[in-house]
A protein has these predicted regions:
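Fe(II)/2-oxoglutarate oxygenase catalytic core
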Residues: 1-179, 185-211
Length: 211
C-alpha cells in the first residue's frame, strides 16, 4: 500500500534547535495511520444473503449527494438500515471489527456511527459512483469509512471498488465478504456495473476533528 502524501501546512512554531550547536532537536513523530486495511470472513455467505434480503425488503430510493441527484456523478439506489431486532447482529459484528481494525491500523479518536448502515444496489447497465470522498462540509465528523462487499463476484461485471492514493487507482479485491476500512478523506469510486447487480454495505464512523 502506498503512503498517503500529506499536504504542507504552515504552523507558527518556535525555531528548531540546531543539533550541530547542542540544545537537542525536535523529536521524530511517526505516522501510525495506514492508507487502508481489510479483512474477510466477517460475515458468512448465508449472512451476506440475509443482509441483501433485508435491504431488498425495504424501499430503495435513488441515491443523491447532499440532496442533489446527478447520474453523471452517482447513479444507484440506496436505503438505510438502523438497529432493531432484525439488524442488531449486523451492527454488533461491525462494531467489534471497527474497534479492532481502528486500534491496529488507524488509532483514530472515534465516538460512534454517524448514521445507519447504507445498503447500496448498483445495477447494469452503468450504475456507479464516481470519484468522491466521504468527508465534506455537511459530513465533517466522518473519520473512518467501511465498505462490505455483499455480492458474489460471479453475479456481476464491472463495479470495481477503487481507492486513490497516488497516480493510479488501487483496485480492491472483489472477494465476497471483503470488508474495507479507510480514512473518510480518501478519494474512492465504484466503476460502472456492466452486467448483473452489485450490492454493498457502507458505514461511516465519526469523531472529534482531526488534530
Amino acid at each position: 500500500m502506498a503512503r498517503l502524501d500529506k499536504p504542507k501546512i504552515e504552523l507558527d512554531l518556535p525555531d528548531r534547535p540546531d543539533p550541530t550547536r547542542g540544545g537537542g532537536a525536535w523529536p521524530l513523530m511517526l505516522d501510525h495511520v495506514e492508507n487502508w486495511a481489510w479483512r474477510n470472513g466477517l460475515f458468512t455467505p448465508e449472512e451476506l444473503d440475509t443482509i441483501i434480503s433485508i435491504g431488498e425488503s425495504t424501499e430503495l430510493v435513488k441515491a443523491s449527494t447532499f440532496g442533489k441527484q446527478s447520474d453523471k456523478n452517482r447513479n444507484s439506489f440506496v436505503t438505510f438500515l438502523f438497529p432493531n431486532e432484525i439488524t442488531n447482529w449486523i451492527f454488533a459484528r461491525l462494531a467489534g471489527a471497527i474497534n479492532e481494525m481502528n486500534q491496529q491500523f488507524f488509532q483514530f479518536d472515534l465516538t460512534g456511527m454517524e448514521q445507519g448502515l447504507q445498503f447500496t444496489k448498483y445495477t447494469a447497465p452503468g450504475e456507479h459512483y464516481d470519484w468522491h470522498i466521504d468527508k465534506g462540509h455537511m459530513t465533517a465528523s466522518r473519520k473512518l469509512s467501511i465498505s462490505v462487499q455483499l455480492s458474489d463476484p460471479k453475479d456481476y461485471k464491472g463495479g470495481e471498488f477503487e481507492l486513490m492514493f497516488g497516480r493510479k487507482p488501487e483496485k480492491i479485491n472483489r472477494e465476497r465478504g471483503m470488508t474495507v476500512f479507510f480514512p473518510s478523506y480518501t478519494l474512492h469510486r465504484v466503476r460502472p456495473v456492466t452486467q448483473g447487480t452489485r450490492y454493498s454495505l457502507v458505514a461511516w464512523i465519526s469523531g472529534p476533528p482531526f488534530k
